[in-house]
UniProtKB/Swiss-Prot annotation:
Any one Gene Ontology cellular component term annotated for this protein: cell projection
Biased composition (Polar residues): 541-556
Subcellular location: Presynaptic cell membrane; Postsynaptic cell membrane; Cell membrane; Endoplasmic reticulum membrane
Membrane topology type: Multi-pass membrane protein
Name used for this protein in its record: Protein wntless
Primary role: A segment polarity gene required for wingless (wg)-dependent patterning processes, acting in both wg-sending cells and wg-target cells. In non-neuronal cells wls directs wg secretion. The wls traffic loop encompasses the Golgi, the cell surface, an endocytic compartment and a retrograde route leading back to the Golgi, and involves clathrin-mediated endocytosis and the retromer complex (a conserved protein complex consisting of Vps35 and Vps26). In neuronal cells (the larval motorneuron NMJ), the wg signal moves across the synapse via the release of wls-containing exosome-like vesicles.
Residues bearing attached sugar chains per UniProt: 58
GO molecular function, one term: Wnt-protein binding
Length: 562
């Protein structure tokens, strides 16, 4: 039997391979740390006040803008205060993005991929009012109109992108108490999310309709400053990210083809671990496929959802593989039958299934609906927020249970190996050296698996933080977030690349000999190998099942044989 490359590769060649992969890992970290900006950037826009004609209020094609030819005449705060009705149902809050800089109009780039808007609301009451602390979960009704135009379009060439009347719930605190007015500042609320940043300029019109019979927006007094924070993916980070994907994609495809060809050259059906490796490589290939290049030409609002699905498939496959990888090296063969996912691992994978389904349902409820209505958010209602939090907590608990169980399985593997090592002194010298080398290599690989699992969890958390939080310090030479994200992404590719190489079947064939001749022949091999610079841990003859891909898994049978 030939065994795997991990078992038969010489120490020098293995050291060169590991050193090369570690160098590639360092380069992935440096690529993100030295050349990539923060994953997300933002711009803060203070809303401009415009007054609209009553006759155009229900005309969704009528859009007000604050810059350029034909812009509306801005209304000052003093004019609003002097009006007896505070210009109710006449005011439009206008946000034009992006803001100009140094007297030069800026535009969005398609490299920036997506755009998210969150709103900070400030409103006031007359101090004569008895209300001092507003009630919690105030319902605010907003008429929202989002428009766009591109380079070369006239200043008034805005086209409606989406329109909706949505409800948001506010939690506010008192920010200022004056002699005539009390101001309240509210928490940020999600406003819109665009899965594709395809156009050059965007315009947002917000109206807060008042209606006495339905009590619409009557509990808010009058609006003061509205601040919109528009968050986008940084174009420089997207370029580095796609460069990394473009470079890694052909290498993973090539090593998968090479691995599967070597498996099919054997006179047996592929083992479970070999199937899992090729499935894992396929999931990584799907993740590496740089589909984002298409968004530079076509408008693809579903790209965010597609990216989440691709990453979810990879996470599910990676977590499944780790359990099978540890389970197949437990050195316990309960039954002579071939291992299958359903027969041996369905209990182990329950946490993975629950967590992945929870996150998938949450993603469909959020970004799936946003394909038709970019103003929708599951977090905007108390019930929706509780449901979303339930899914996230359920996924988090499942992840914690999974990681603890994976650590337990790896600990059990190490314990079993330790128990079996007590049998090594009774073996022949050649066989003892063979298994000591295999055990050392396997322990190193399992520790690398634990490190990869820990960094994967940390990378997932940092990725989620990058979507919702922003670093306000612009004077940082190396951005840890970008370095970490590119480093973890490179680590996935390097780790799977190494597994496909090390667990590929070796084509080295070793002569079959009788047990009585084994010690003499093996000692001669050791003497001959010692004269060389490379000592290979050759796969010694055994009576193991030909369907096993690692001689370490048949260690127990070897002990009995000796």
């Amino acid at each position: 039997m030939s065994g795997t490359i991990l078992e038969n590769l010489s120490g020098r060649k293995l050291s060169i391979l590991v050193a090369t992969l570690l160098l590639c890992q360092v380069l992935c970290f440096l690529l993100g740390g030295l050349y990539a900006p923060l994953p997300a950037g933002h711009v803060t826009v203070l809303g401009s006040l415009c007054r609209e004609d009553h006759a155009r209020q229900n005309d969704t094609s009528f859009l007000l803008y604050s810059r350029g030819a034909g812009a509306c005449i801005p209304v000052t705060r003093e004019e609003v205060e002097q009006d007896s009705t505070k210009m109710a149902n006449e005011l439009v809050h206008v946000f034009q993005m992006p803001l100009p800089r140094d007297l030069r109009d800026l535009d969005y780039s398609r490299w920036q991929q997506n755009l998210i808007g969150v709103l900070q609301v400030e409103f006031g009451y007359d101090s004569s009012s008895e209300l001092r602390e507003p009630p919690r979960e105030l319902q605010l009704t907003i008429d929202m109109r989002l428009a766009y135009r591109n380079k070369g379009d006239p200043d008034n060439g805005w086209k409606l992108y989406a329109h909706g009347v949505e409800h948001r719930y506010l939690d506010c605190v008192t920010s200022h108490v004056g002699p005539t007015e009390t101001l309240y500042s509210c928490d940020m609320i999600p406003l819109f999310e665009l899965g594709a940043l395809h156009h050059s300029f965007y315009l947002l019109n917000l109206r807060f309709p008042l209606d006495t019979p339905s009590q619409m927006n009557l509990q808010f007094g009058h609006m003061h400053d509205l601040t919109l924070t528009a968050i986008h993916q940084n174009g420089g980070f997207t370029q580095i990210w796609l460069l990394l994907k473009t470079m890694l994609f052909p290498f993973v495809v090539g090593i998968m083809i090479w691995f599967w060809r070597r498996v099919h050259l054997l006179q047996r059906s592929p083992a479970l671990l070999e199937y899992m490796l090729i499935y894992l490589g396929a999931a990584l290939t799907f993740l590496n496929l740089p589909l984002e290049y298409l968004s530079l030409v076509y408008e693809m609002p579903y790209m965010l959802l597609l990216s989440d699905i691709r990453q979810g498939i990879f996470y599910a496959m990676l977590l499944t593989f780790w359990l099978v990888f540890a389970g197949e090296h437990m050195l316990i063969q309960d039954a002579p039958n071939k291992s299958t996912i359903r027969s041996r691992y369905w209990k182990h994978l329950s946490a993975v299934v629950v967590g992945c389904i929870s996150l998938f349902v949450f993603d469909i409820c959020e970004r799936g609906v946003q394909l038709r209505n970019p103003f929708y958010s599951i977090w905007t209602t108390p019930l929706g927020a509780k449901v979303a939090m339930t899914f996230i907590v359920l996924a988090g608990v499942s992840a914690a249970i999974y990681f603890l169980f994976l650590c337990y399985m790896i600990w059990k593997v190490f314990r079993n190996i330790g128990d079996k090592r007590t049998s090594l002194p009774s073996m022949s010298q050649a066989r003892r050296l063979h298994y000591e080398g295999l055990i050392y290599r396997f322990k190193f690989l399992m520790l690398a698996t634990l490190v990869c699992a820990a960094l994967t969890v940390a990378g997932f958390i940092m990725g989620q933080m990058a979507e919702g939080q922003w670093d306000w310090n612009d004077n940082v030479a190396i951005q840890p977030t970008s370095a970490f994200l590119t480093g973890v992404y490179g680590m996935w590719n390097i780790y799977i690349f190494a597994l496909l190489i090390l667990y590929a079947p070796s084509h080295k064939q070793w002569p079959t000999m009788h047990h009585s001749d084994e010690t003499t022949q093996s000692n001669e091999n050791i003497v001959a190998s010692a004269a060389s610079e490379e000592i290979e841990f050759s796969h010694l003859p055994s009576d193991s099942n030909p369907s096993e891909i690692s001689s370490l898994t048949s260690f127990t049978r070897k002990v009995a044989f000796d």
